[in-house]
Amino acid sequence: MNIFSNEEKKVKSCPVCLSLQPKPFIKIQALQYWTCPICEVKFLSPNHWLSKKDEYEFYLTHENDADNLGYRKFVSKLLEPLLEKLSKKTAGLDYGCGPSSALAKMFVEHGFKITLYDPFFYPAKDVLNFKYDFITCSEVVEHFHYPAKEFNKLNS
């Protein structure tokens, strides 16, 4: 018995490595998952992704306040090693920063120039046309629908 509908067979490529060989993996309740035999990623069928509106509303529930001391301590685990490697004359992009970026605020406090991009909260795509000395994607990658496309965008 095939547990995957004909609609599910429309999954044509792996969202991570872009292989054209995704295979049905498992169905859990109504959610259908796929696997890639090349990179071994497991991914949810696009048919089950949240709508853009629901995704936006979900992100509004995140409590990553740039002034919250506990969250700043958490973010400093990324910031501190970067501060050791970067010159203050460098410019960075905080990609997928959300509505309030503690990381960007902390970089600015240390004298860095940071540009914000987020498809929901800072959607000005023209900032993606510039070159940056560094790019951060803190707590972001797991939200990418098509990671390969996002990383290619950042690499161009």
Q: Which stretches of residues belong to each language-model region?
A:
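A short, conserved alpha-helix within the catalytic core of class I
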Residues: 144-154
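Conserved N-terminal segment of class I S-adenosyl-L-methionine
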Residues: 1-134, 138, 149-151
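A short His-aromatic
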Residues: 139, 143
